[in-house]
């Protein structure tokens, strides 16, 4: 059972990003000017508009990679950087909120930032220990050994 813990963690972490981007893509495709609205949403948090296609690409492609266990080390580093960017974005966004806003808004942003910092740490750990059960990386490595 212990060897499958990495698999479970990998699938759940990958699913977090993959399912999230599916909902975002559904919004983009179904809403009038959905992509522009997504860009504006990101820019309202202080991220440049170019982050929209990068975010879609990272979550979609690397989410699938992580679920399948393909290039686990690289994928983990990509998601670690992505998570750190989001954590810092939420922390910096806290400073741009007027003081008359409810304290719960600050708490919400703080918690989101801390959640992304936790993901950052988890992805760094996964990058340090990329050997996991039932991954495409292991299948490829076993085929190379047989040749």
Enumerate the language-model features and the residues they cover.
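Generic signal for short, ordered secondary-structure residues
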Residues: 40, 63-64
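Extended, low-polarity transmembrane helix blocks
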Residues: 1-33, 46-57, 61, 68-147
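Cytosolic, membrane-interface loops and tails of multi-pass inner-membrane proteins
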Residues: 35-42
């Amino acid at each position: 059972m212990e060897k499958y813990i990495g698999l479970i963690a990998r699938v759940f972490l990958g699913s977090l990003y993959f399912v999230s981007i599916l909902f975002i893509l559904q919004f983009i495709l179904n809403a009038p000017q959905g992509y522009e609205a997504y860009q504006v949403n990101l820019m309202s948090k202080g991220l440049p508009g170019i982050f929209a296609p990068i975010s879609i690409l990272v979550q979609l492609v690397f989410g699938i990679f992580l679920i399948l266990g393909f290039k686990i080390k690289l994928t983990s580093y990509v998601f670690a950087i992505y998570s750190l960017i989001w954590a810092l974005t939420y922390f910096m966004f806290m400073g741009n909120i007027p003081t008359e806003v409810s304290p719960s808004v600050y708490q919400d942003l703080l918690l989101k930032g801390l959640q992304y910092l936790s993901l950052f740490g988890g992805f760094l750990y996964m990058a340090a220990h990329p050997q996991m059960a039932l991954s495409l990386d292991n299948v490829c490595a076993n085929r190379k050994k047989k040749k």
